[in-house]
Amino acid sequence: MKLSRRSFMKANAVAAAAAAAGLSVPGVARAVVGQQEAIKWDKAPCRFCGTGCGVLVGTQQGRVVACQGDPDAPVNRGLNCIKGYFLPKIMYGKDRLTQPMLRMKDGSYHKDGEFTPVSWEQAFDVMEEKFKTALKEKGPEAIGMFGSGQWTIWEGYAAAKLFKAGFRSNNIDPNARHCMASAVVGFMRTFGMDEPMGCYDDIEQADAFVLWGSNMAEMHPILWSRITNRRLSDPNVKVAVLSTFQHRSFELADNGIVFTPQSDLVILNYIANYIIQNNAVNQDFFTKHVNLRKGATDIGYGLRPTHPLEKAAKNPGSDASEPMSFDEYKAFVAEYTLDKTAEMTGVPKDQLEQLAQLYADPNKRVISYWTMGFNQHTRGVWANNLVYNLHLLTGKISQPGCGPFSLTGQPSACGTAREVGTFSHRLPADMVVTNEKHRDICEKHWQIPAGTIPAKVGLHAVAQDRALKDGKLNVYWVMCNNNMQAGPNINEDRMPGWRDPRNFIIVSDPYPTVSALSADLILPTAMWVEKEGAYGNAERRTQFWRQQIKAPGEAKSDLWQLVQFSRRFKTEEVWPEALLAQKPELRGKTLYDVLFATPAVSKFPLSELKEDQLNDESRELGFYLQKGLFEEYAWFGRGHGHDLAPFDDYHNARGLRWPVVEGKETQWRYSEGNDPYVKAGEGYKFYGKPDGKAVIFALPFEPAAESPDNEYDLWLSTGRVLEHWHTGSMTRRVPELHRAFPEAVVFIHPLDAKARDLRRGDKVKVSSRRGEVISIVETRGRNRPPQGLVYMPFFDAAQLVNNLTLDATDPLSKETDFKKCAVKLAKV
């Protein structure tokens, strides 16, 4: 049957999504129209992925009752994915938390006690005692926080400021460490600045799309609908999809490539070799704008230093590199021939050549997209660097319709985790804690004593787990994530660390997640439009929303929790005498006074809020807290290539892409005529680097940390499905989404199932060297692994897939490889 462009788009973007949830979209529309007069509408960005779709939120009698795509939103143009259509229902799960819960026994806190409702005063009393004891006995390195790419911008900023400036601890890291850290380090190594240079407008102008380890059809369906539209509008447009298994994005692919896990590094170097051998290097661009460097190799796998793989590594964790000539680089990639690449990857030669030709053709505008397949990789930084190489060799970058683009999975992994600087090594606007000048800039702007911010990099996500188990990290606050389910290797470090009597764990969450139920204190959290917020999406678009309803019961926003808790500490209790001597006027003041009630933050009066505008935090404090924090934070980037617009501009717009200079947003960075930081006559300028040149890195293939063997004979790759988001803590509480995909399954090749006497629907035990999970065999459906590999989603709290995964990380980014470990199957 011939499928028209119109019917294909409709089927993929609307009908299929609605059918998956068992709901008629026209029925939803009729219900909304029928109540329109009684519903109040306001804009907000979607709560889910990093695409940053705009939605219109309908509220009635203090509840969110409807949601629709915002037709004025440039990202999604009125279209939602199936999760977006059900946004209202994520707010109202039957088990929504509405008051603090503390483990208690005989009337007081006990590690093995039962969760008991307490007041916020009681909750903060216990937290205060635990924090002060740890700080007094062990110092700032004994406390830590694990935050989120789902924090609003000012929540992340407040958390980073409280920990790094207030408690003097860099032991704060976001869950974006698990998803975007490799992209960050890749950007910084190649360009000296974080985040993509292009934008979503590239889609309508591209001639070819290459997906590296990205199932956009399910993980970024709105962007996929735009790619689909472009592909079906022009027969000359091509789509290539690379993955370790077939998935829904392959349905549109002209060239669907399944490769052996880890061998994407080989393919990337082969394409670079092909470009050079076919004289496709853009010599003018290359000569003017590119440097070449050879990176250190044999850098280990981010495991504990005692692990045999770390002991065997020659350069564990090394980020070193040295200059090299073009001839040396040419010789380096020449090793990656077509024959060798086909042999190492398992990809047919004709498919490899077709892929390379897309990049080599000077008349093809190519966009490379990637997500977790690249980033959750023990050489994820290298993979990012190597794809940049292809665009830098050909000059296909920083222009409409072509460029490398790292997609994000969380709504503010860019705007909060990265730009704000909530990583353990970062400060706002790409500054880092190890740079004395950067620390000085922050300390002066925050008006705190010189030397307040520690120079030592704090514990990253996996290191926090290890420090908890080792008894070195004793008070741990987890906000806006479900890391007990989402993080790697649950059994060996995280669970023992959380339940260690030496440690006190706080989890702030709207629901009783696996993490919350593993903690000692649960704090009920306001979510989405129950607070005023701001997110930054994958294309550098910053979007604001207003508080539209009140949170249920005693639930409070993460911002409220951070700011109110800061009142519990006086400077003398957290800062040494040497610091206080520099600023004696700060003696006797609380951290709230010196961090959040300063003239810079508190200068915006409540009169700037409309009379009927909800804003619980600001009205309680007596000033416009969110505006004060945002303007203080935005100062760091203005004039330095990270320019954010004035606060009020965002409430009047559907988002703006930074740098925003003189009221104009930037679509394409680093190119003349598009970027205000590139002067006339410069052509291109990668101004994150001192000489304005980007870097091509020579980096080889290196094997995975763990591969199948005779005992554990299958690769395991983990990930998501369309209907659920991450650990399912929100989407599984939406009945329609839960019905559409009620439990996790093991996607397996039919021949692998047959060889193990397994049939579709059978219960199966999946085991690794670290743990086991009971799941269900699936030999059909959307994901079709090759022989030798199984795929499991991690949304199901009843099947903790991360009991299986290895906590190997990229040694440079410290990001976990969730895509490669060895497992075996046994029929139950």
From Swiss-Prot:
Gene3D superfamilies reported in the protein's UniProt record: 2.40.40.20, 3.30.200.210, 3.40.50.740, Dimethylsulfoxide Reductase, domain 2 (3.40.228.10)
Superkingdom of origin: Bacteria
Intrachain S-S bonds: none
Record bears the keyword RNA-binding: no
Cofactor note: Binds 1 [4Fe-4S] cluster. Binds 1 molybdenum-bis(molybdopterin guanine dinucleotide) (Mo-bis-MGD) cofactor per subunit.
Ranges for domain 4Fe-4S Mo/W bis-MGD-type: 39-95
Record note on modification: Predicted to be exported by the Tat system. The position of the signal peptide cleavage has not been experimentally proven.
Record-listed E.C. numbers: 1.9.6.1
Location(s), subcellular: Periplasm
GO cellular component: membrane; nitrate reductase complex; periplasmic space
Residue sites binding [4Fe-4S] cluster per the record: C46, C49, C53, C81
Names of required cofactors: [4Fe-4S] cluster; Mo-bis(molybdopterin guanine dinucleotide)
Signal peptide positions on this chain: 1-31
Function (record text): Catalytic subunit of the periplasmic nitrate reductase complex NapAB. Receives electrons from NapB and catalyzes the reduction of nitrate to nitrite.
Family classification: Belongs to the prokaryotic molybdopterin-containing oxidoreductase family. NasA/NapA/NarB subfamily.
NCBIfam families on file: NAPA (TIGR01706), PRK13532.1 (NF010055), TAT_signal_seq (TIGR01409)
Protein name, as recorded: Periplasmic nitrate reductase
Source taxonomy: Bacteria, Pseudomonadati, Pseudomonadota, Gammaproteobacteria, Enterobacterales
